Each structure stands twice: as structure tokens, then as C-alpha cells.
């Protein structure tokens, strides 16, 4: 066959009948980057349209996204240098700003799906993903 037949793409009805994959908002996971503080928004230069947000603005962003049908969010903490240690102790502190924010998100928006990562690299002063002695 030298030419691909276009008959299967001629109309929307035919395309929807034979498509193998349909992506909806149920399939999307929105990445969010959490910083400590209040009413701050910092652009992530390498990811246009993505920002580091404080807890108050992150809640508003999640509410907005849920209104659009996006319910799944992957929340990454951005830890200040002063809170990073060789043993990544901030990562397992029960009252950290990250865990407080996750609890607040679930309390205010129980229908949201929050995805987290147990990686230690945001908390370790040497940047390793695991604590090493």
C-alpha cells in the first residue's frame, strides 16, 4: 500500500467509532509545586504555565482545576535550604508545611486525588533521594 486510506478519518463519527484511545480529564494528573509562606507564586521557568505556590494559592488552584474536571494532583514540596539536613529530618516531621497542606487539601476538597512521593531528595542537604550514613 503506497497511500494510507483516509476513509477512516473522514468524519468525526467514523473517528470516534474506530479510535482506540480517548483521553479525558479523568486521565490527567496536574503537577503542583508547594512552597512555604502565604500568597506567593513563583514561575517554574522550565515549565511554562506552572508555578510554585504557597498553600493558600494551591488550594485555589486545585479548586479551579476541579471545576474543569481535573481531580488528580501530584504535589511536590520545595523545601528551603535552611530546612535541609543530611538526614532529611524535615521529610518525616509530622507537622511539616507539606504534610499540613496535604491534610488541609483533603479536608477542604475530599474528592481530590492527591499523589505524593516519598523521595527524600527535597529534604536532604546533599540532594540524595535516600538517607545515607
Model-flagged regions — what are they?
Residues 9, 27, 53-57, 93-96, ...:
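Conserved active-site and cofactor/substrate-binding residues in soluble primary-metabolism enzymes
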Residues 1-2, 33, 73-75:
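Short hydrophobic/aromatic-rich motifs at helix boundaries and adjacent loops
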Residues 23-50, 113-133:
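N-terminal small/glycine-rich loop or linker at the start of catalytic domains
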Residues 1-19:
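N-terminal amphipathic/basic leader segments beginning at the initiator methionine
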Residues 84-118:
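Alpha-helix-loop-beta-strand connector modules within alpha/beta enzyme cores
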